[in-house]
């Protein structure tokens, strides 16, 4: 199994319930295909660097997971078909990126405890 990280941007016109529903849909696709979700972060509403589909903001979401390579194709097909997703990027993490992500998670968890 390889470790992947995917960041996707949801359209800003969604309510909180609709946004969570979309995220749960993609997490469900991953778990149904046998992926192990390691981390999930909601980065919130952010300004885009340039307009995408006439929108200047979007809800950013990050999901870090371990999966087989064929799962990525199914996930990205669902990203393309879903009108709520305006942009996405999935990449395979090498061992250094995975170590860095683990350190970052540990730092965030210690900050939350303080």
Swiss-Prot record:
Gene Ontology annotations for the cellular component aspect, listed alphabetically: cytoplasm; ribonucleoprotein complex; ribosome
Alphabetical list of Gene3D superfamilies matching this protein: 3.30.70.60
UniProt keyword list: Ribonucleoprotein, Ribosomal protein, RNA-binding, rRNA-binding
GO molecular function, one term: structural constituent of ribosome
Superkingdom of origin organism: Bacteria
Task performed by this protein: Binds together with bS18 to 16S ribosomal RNA.
Protein's UniProt name: Small ribosomal subunit protein bS6
